[in-house]
Regions:
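Extracytoplasmic beta-strand/coil segments of soluble accessory domains associated
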Residues: 52, 80-119
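Short acidic/polar hinge/loop motifs at secondary-structure boundaries
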Residues: 91, 118-146, 194
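A beta-strand signature from Gram-negative outer-membrane beta-barrel systems
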Residues: 134-173, 177, 218, 790
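Transmembrane beta-barrel wall of Gram-negative outer-membrane proteins
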Residues: 184-287, 318-338, 511-513
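Outer-membrane beta-barrel signature, preferentially recognizing the C-terminal barrel domain
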Residues: 316-325, 455-462, 522, 533-592, ...
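Gram-negative outer-membrane beta-barrel transporters
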Residues: 589-591, 609-699
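C-terminal beta-signal and adjacent terminal beta-strands/loops
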Residues: 694-698, 721-791
Length: 791
């Protein structure tokens, strides 16, 4: 962290760095190539117009495309930040973070994340990839593919987000970006990056690098009760119901280092490309929690002289180190029988985490110290080979077929040191000042680390896919129809003694079809239908049993799970507006089969009578539907060509029936919308704008816990000044409304308590809560000052 500079001095340093490294002269004219115009660096740094949403023209699938110009003026830090402005993407992240994208509000594992059209592994057990690992500066455009196609893997129930990074045929010249971000706790973090593209030998290359300081100073406030408003409307004022209050600071500090490079050769009959990116993250998550037995008092330990209200002091620190890289090569050759392409890719993800948690409990005859240490290591490697061929069937139709072979290896290692727990002296409590001292001071040397239950395992997934696809492009109509056959062999090794190996395999047939029909000169109907799938979460596949994982209930893994499958359709209409605007509406529906849900096996749990062993099984069905509207246009039709407006709203719904009743898919927001305006002032070389975003509430229900989540609104503004054709400076304010994330937790120890039954199964007088918790989290506004210089 940088602590000694002011925001003003950071801005001066950013400008000086950009100016000092810039050549005296810069290229201004873009270069032409066979595929169109290559963007000059000046066009990226000094935006000559307002960016709008594009519609996909090269494919029959329903695709929404957003170039970097659409996002850049608000200076998003990551791909996740950029996606907050597009339709139907929600997040359940902490405030001012955007990691697991939830397309159509569904859990992240239902969305396929691609980078340059290829899948990448991540650390998450649900197979999702956190988008806050990709710096926004690397992005050329973002594509939302609402349906599926036989040419891609079918892991896209909600749809696909394709992050297209810049390459040498999309940039000529270079630019530097430098600046700082100022946070609510007066911390300042740097942001420095650069990109350069140009000709090299017979082709073109691009290299880019970025360094980003990350910081999130969250403050959490929790109130806990032994009953809820379901049973006691006066719970908040009833002293017999109040349990404790927790005040917590949760600070996330990190440094991201990223690099990407591409090299492309486009010949008369043969094309070659190779691209890669690398991201390294060092991150420290520091939580400090104080629990009090009073709703408002802030003082010293309970049972001291004089007695205070502090019952627990907890210090929790996680140090995380992540490396992620991907390399892909493609060779395409056009010959008398069509075009043949070969793609080879390798992706690797590695995470190492060391977490400590130290706690002192004061509400005892003698205060007690408890210490825990955990080490987590996750490595995920994927190697893939893709061979495809296409040839014409007629003047307007062609046939594509091909196959994919992929070898995925994932290893997990979770080890724990034996818990250190011992009593302190009464003198340790007397005069203890939690704001000056820390439970860490009572730490003693730990013993050797040993595997956690089910914590050491490997998963090998080999898949062989084949597909065939026909597509046509006729005046006013573009269509495609195909089928994909996916086969998977799975080997799971639980290496925690006693070691266990289990094999599984499955096959899925996934047909798909899409069509686009022009309506008049500027309208278009889009329609698609497809069968898609979602593979089981890794943490469900381990055969280990985790005791008291779900309240007092146990969780037993199931390595024989099959993927979920879904039939669905999208139907939409798009209308071009003015010079470059577009408006669209879309309805979608998914019928999910073989839904993976936690199921009561009927076996008594480790905590005795009233508790059970739960296991994920393919037993459920679900439905998802919604309506999506988006608008992006200038106001030239009312005489304001330099004013751009954009907005979108999505209404989202779903239905699942579990053992507790009907609910939505976990975490699905009821709606999400955002709208904004950008005013360009060409005569002054300036621009300003604002965007407003609001996400509806969400509900999660699992065995032993229910969570209601709500977010406050988010307001962002920017002011931009351009200097000549090569230099731009922007000031951006985000989270200006200091929106809070608010959660309400219903917690239960047994299934019957959650159902509102006595342990003998007879009806109870309301549900029996183990705990009802209200939590609020805020982080404050963030201000940026960024400078860019093109050369």
């Amino acid at each position: 962290m940088i602590r000694i500079f002011s925001l003003h001095s950071a801005a001066v340093a950013a400008l000086a760095a950009a100016l000092a490294t810039a050549p005296a002269a810069a290229q201004e004219a873009p270069i032409q190539n066979a595929d169109g115009t290559i963007t000059s660096a000046q066009d990226i740094v000094v935006l000559g117009s307002i960016g709008y949403r594009n519609r996909g023209e090269n494919e029959a699938e329903p695709v929404l495309s957003y170039d970097s110009e659409f996002f850049q003026r608000f200076e998003p830090l990551t791909a996740g930040d950029a996606l907050k402005r597009v339709p139907s993407v929600t997040f359940l992240s902490d405030v001012i973070e955007s990691d697991g994208a939830r397309l159509r509000g569904l859990p992240p594992g239902y969305t396929q994340i691609l980078i340059n059209g290829e899948k990448v592994p991540g650390s998450n057990a649900d197979r999702s990839f956190f988008l806050d690992r990709i710096p926004a500066e690397l992005i050329d455009r973002v594509e939302i593919v609402r349906s599926s196609s036989a040419r891609r893997t079918g892991d896209a129930v909600a749809g696909t987000l394709n992050i297209k990074l810049r390459d040498g045929y999309e940039l000529d010249g270079g630019y530097l970006r430098a600046g700082g971000l100022y946070y609510d706790d007066k911390e300042l973090e740097p942001s420095i990056g650069g990109v350069f593209g140009g000709a090299l030998g017979p082709g073109r290359f691009l290299i880019g690098g970025n360094f980003q300081g990350r910081h999130n100073p969250k403050k959490k406030y929790s109130l806990r009760y032994n009953d809820s408003p379901e049973n006691d409307p006066n719970y908040a004022t009833d002293p017999d119901v109040f349990e404790n209050r927790e005040d917590q600071t949760d600070t996330r500090d990190g440094k991201d280092y990223s690099f990407n490079a591409t090299y492309d050769i486009k010949g008369d009959t043969t094309d070659f490309s190779v691209n890669g990116f690398y991201v390294h993250t060092d991150r420290t998550e520091t939580e400090r929690s104080f629990e009090y037995n009073h709703p408002t008092n802030i003082n010293g330990p309970i049972r001291a002289t004089p007695p205070g209200n502090l019952t627990v002091d907890n210090a929790n620190v996680a140090k995380i180190n992540q490396d992620n890289y991907s390399v892909n090569g493609k060779l395409a050759h056009r010959w008398s029988l069509g075009e043949t392409s070969l793609k080879i890719g390798y992706a690797w993800f590695d995470e190492k985490q060391f977490e400590t948690e130290y706690e002192v409990e004061f509400d005892r005859a003698l205060p007690r110290f408890t210490g825990d240490q955990t080490r987590t290591g996750i490595t995920d490697k994927e190697f893939s080979v893709r061979l495809e061929h296409e040839f014409p069937l007629g003047e307007n139709t062609k046939l594509l077929f091909g196959g994919l072979w992929q070898d995925k290896d994932r290893s997990t290692s979770i080890t724990e040191a034996p818990r250190d727990r011992y009593n302190l002296t009464a003198a340790n409590r007397q005069g203890y000042d939690q704001f000056a001292r820390n439970p860490t001071e009572f730490m003693r040397p730990f013993g050797a680390f040993v595997p956690a239950v089910g914590g050491i395992n490997t998963i090998e997934e080999k898949r062989l896919d084949g597909f065939v696809l026909a597509e046509g492009d006729m005046p006013g109509v573009k269509w495609e129809a195909g089928v994909r056959y996916e086969t998977t062999d799975l080997t799971i090794d639980d290496l925690t003694p006693p070691a266990t190996r289990i094999d599984n395999d499955y096959e899925k047939l996934l047909p798909s079809a899409s069509v686009k029909i022009d309506v008049g000169a500027r309208g278009r109907i889009t329609a698609s239908a497809a069968r898609t799938s979602r593979r089981p979460e890794f943490n469900f596949l381990s055969p280990a049993q985790l005791d008291a994982e779900l309240g007092d209930n146990d969780l037993l893994g199931n390595p024989l799970l099959d993927p979920e499958t879904a039939w669905g359709f999208d139907l939409g209409y798009e209308q071009k507006l003015g010079r470059s605007g577009i408006a669209g509406v879309n309805v979608f529906y998914r019928k999910v089969n073989d839904l993976i849900e936690l199921t009561n096996t009927g076996v008594e749990g480790s905590e005795g009578a009233g508790t059970f062993v739960y296991q994920p099984q393919n037993i459920g069905d679900g439905k998802v539907w919604g309506v999506e509207f988006d608008l992006s246009t200038d106001l030239g039709f009312v005489g304001l060509p330099d004013t751009g407006v954009f907005g979108n709203i999505s209404w989202l719904d779903s239905k699942i029936i579990d053992e507790f009743g009907e609910r939505r898919f976990n975490g699905q927001s009821k709606y999400v919308y955002n709208f904004g305006v950008i005013q360009d002032i060409p005569s002054a070389g300036a621009a300003f704008g604002a965007t407003y975003r609001k996400q509806g509430g969400a509900f999660d229900r699992t065995v032993g816990e229910e969570v209601f989540t709500a977010y406050g609104a988010d307001l962002e503004v920017f002011v931009e000044k351009r200097f000549g054709k090569s230099f731009t400076i922007r000031a951006v304010g985000s989270n200006l409304l200091n929106g809070a994330k608010r959660e309400a937790f219903n917690k239960f120890t047994t299934r019957n308590a959650q159902l509102g039954l006595e342990e003998d199964g007879t009806p109870a007088d309301g549900r029996r809560f183990d705990e009802y918790e209200l939590e609020s989290e805020k982080a404050g506004p963030v201000f940026q000052l960024m400078a860019r210089y093109a050369f």
